[in-house]
Amino acid sequence: MSEWQIERLSRSHDRSAFSCGKPSLDEFIRRFVTQYEKRNLGRTFVAVRQGETLIGGYYTLASSSVSFEHLPEESARKLPKHPVPVVLIARLAVDASIQGQKLGEKLLIDALSRCLDLAEQLGVHAVEVDAIDDQARSFYLKYGFVSLRDDLRHLFLPVNTIRDALDSSRFQ
């Protein structure tokens, strides 16, 4: 079995058979991602095996901001009282046929690494996620995300925490 590669979504990727078990995530990659990309609302990256076009998983990144009032107290103490720039992991999904094989972790680490690169180019304080359900929330909590004050599934991970984790190979 060949190793997964993560690359920018293109027309050559086969999205038709993707099914993660969450209808909104399945429908996004099959029907809406092209318009999302054309309108510059986000960028989608897919996991494929070398030489294949079938998508095993994907994630989408977009720019966003988090309201100061929603920040965890520890973060809020250190920041000005206005919205904080973040990168949003808008979606992250793995095909049901390969769930439990660590592809979600590989996608998340790739997304966080990409977010760190973005933070070197422009002001980004953290990565934000709106977990689709409690199972997804538990997944993100394992990687150090913390809940924001507005919703337990609205999660946040500071760029400095990501940098430290990637530098120490804690995520690898």
Language-model region placement:
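Conserved acyl-donor/pantetheine-binding loop and adjacent beta-alpha core of acyl/acetyltransferases
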Residues: Y58-R91
